[in-house]
């Protein structure tokens, strides 16, 4: 193969002291980069599965995503993870997508492999640092020319089964070029191969890097790049070439006591364009021995290098005098001037790699959590849609029918009233109408002032205008009377009916938005009677017939003159000829006709609207099931993995202490210290199948999403142990707050009545908080109530805790505390009230002895059947009457009859005040061990 050459094993570089460039440091570096490779693989796998998840969402629900921009878009996240998308309508999940910025950033992180970049004050010191890192003399350190004349090309060291040297263009192809190293054995790479020859005219040869493959443990997980001399390519350009494909761990080799002006300029350029920390290491002079401790600087002294780097912004006041940063885990620049402390490079590289992985894991987990929240909110919206839409349709039908019947009753009832009202109006307004008619000025008619007669056409026009005046005044009076009769309807339910219709039509196509129009027509029949008169109605035509008779009676052979008396006479004849009873009958008849027509059209359009909703609700229910059964659990597991990766990177895997207890799905251990929390309890859960994995992941998401509350046990974090039980299984380690004991143990030891009632109040407060967050615990029992050293209670084990919209009706919980409706699969948060009632029985009894009704049951099935038939705990002689009534109310068989916890809490406070604060409490037989 081209480039292979015989070589001798290079001489091993003697370390500068214990922990220096020897095997210990190399092993630490290997472990650090190997750990990064494993965690990067986990991140890469999680990202791939997340991308597949979003692709599946898009493919399976693309039909439900609207094409309009208003339909929603990708769930965008801001720099801090804030939401930047518009809310999605219920059921439109295909619009949920991987935010492009986050996806691009994460893809770049997982594609970038680590690389150690060696910069330095000159090429000799860079080569010397490379030899120290590898522990072998690979590069010459004394034969290279001065920095001014140096032509050192870029060097890349990678892993290979054989040592091999070749020239290659970075990231492209290998050059066919004969090297000195190919011509014989060598201890170190020949200087001629390291430098760009001055007489070289081949541009590719000048740009090429020397690639060295070696069988070395460190190179298995990380490449090492030695930057070329500054004359060939500035360090900032070299770094710019690397950052697109590699994650650089930057080292800067020093051999002088101070930075030169050129060094400072180079470092300023790097800091200007990049934010990477740098590991500054002062390489010992060749052949020098370890400096005696007596000649070292005292701890309070800072070297000139330290001051210069502080001025450049690389070091801060938090760094100790040796240049090592404080306890902050975020990567910071580091200065090491003692050669035996080169081992700090492993700490520095760990911080650099960890910072990038943690940031990536956080970004990925933000995407997971944000989309999970969207799913849960969508589940709530879909569940509400499924519940409320049929009720809205029924309400609309009922209320419209009530409106129709009310208006019809008004039309029937008001006919006689309207007749009397018309007569009364005519009598009241007669004088005013005659005066108005006498004084009116005609439009479009020229009346001679000298008393001359007018033509027949002008006469008819004048008579028509007088008639219109009378009719308009009568119209207004009738309309006002009718409107006042139905004002109550608008105030009572018309507004609610309109809003209900609007909500039903909102999710439907515009073409069927006619139901509201028919409702408006029903209302127009009552509110806009005047429009009927002006639009050529039957009433108007009837009036015109009467007016024609008037015209015939008052028309003479010779046309009259238009005088005040004539106008009064015309108006009088018109008023006298009007029949109040016929007018009232005609008005009400027309009102009923319009009502019937609009009512029938409304009913037909409502049936059409109901049919459209029926198909939509069927699709919504299918989608709701997919969200609960597939989408949310699948994404929750990815979220659990990304969050666990973040936790293990920041805090490492916790150490298991002594076993504290065992449950149905896990073992609880003592954990002394983790993530700054002390002491902790660690619950190890080995999910036996996919369903349990999903349930655990959702539980974790709900717990992490909850704000901290003093009545809930804090969850500090999680770690996935892929080698649990010697590698036989995968376990999820949940690290949480450790408390003193559980309520079961507390009752066995003995607690005073006041303490027990306070515990009951604490439990109610905790359950109320869960319900306020939309969660149902579903497993309230003695073992899931923990007590601190002051005997204050906290609720734990949210394993069965779910939002109401995410509950599938599965039968879960502890049989004794399970409400009867749990067996039907249809239940709500009132099951927690039932469970509290049973818990309160134990609290009031002061013992853990089973109730007789439950103790007689031979099996779970027997117990469940008895509970369904109404079996409940018995009343004990020690029970207070009010306490017993509260228990009975809480475990009522009808969920709707159980009291709300907002009512239970003040009742408990009153009981506690009465029994404990009034000094009327009898001495408790149990022991009070609250300490």
Curated annotation (Swiss-Prot):
Region (Disordered): 1-24
Any GO BP annotation: cellular response to fibroblast growth factor stimulus
Entry superkingdom: Eukaryota
Chain sites annotated for binding ATP: 660-668, 683
Domain Protein kinase: 654-908
The keyword ATP-binding belongs to this UniProt entry's keyword annotation: yes
GO cellular component terms attached to this protein's record: anchoring junction; apical plasma membrane; basolateral plasma membrane; cytoplasm
Localization (cell): Cytoplasm; Cell membrane; Apical cell membrane; Basolateral cell membrane
Active site, per annotation: 779 (proton acceptor)
Catalysis performed (reactions): L-seryl-[protein] + ATP = O-phospho-L-seryl-[protein] + ADP + H(+); L-threonyl-[protein] + ATP = O-phospho-L-threonyl-[protein] + ADP + H(+); L-tyrosyl-[protein] + ATP = O-phospho-L-tyrosyl-[protein] + ADP + H(+)
Coiled-coil stretches noted in the UniProt entry, renumbered to this chain: 397-424
Name of the protein this chain belongs to: Dual serine/threonine and tyrosine protein kinase
Molecular function as annotated in GO: ATP binding; protein serine kinase activity; protein serine/threonine kinase activity; protein serine/threonine/tyrosine kinase activity; protein tyrosine kinase activity
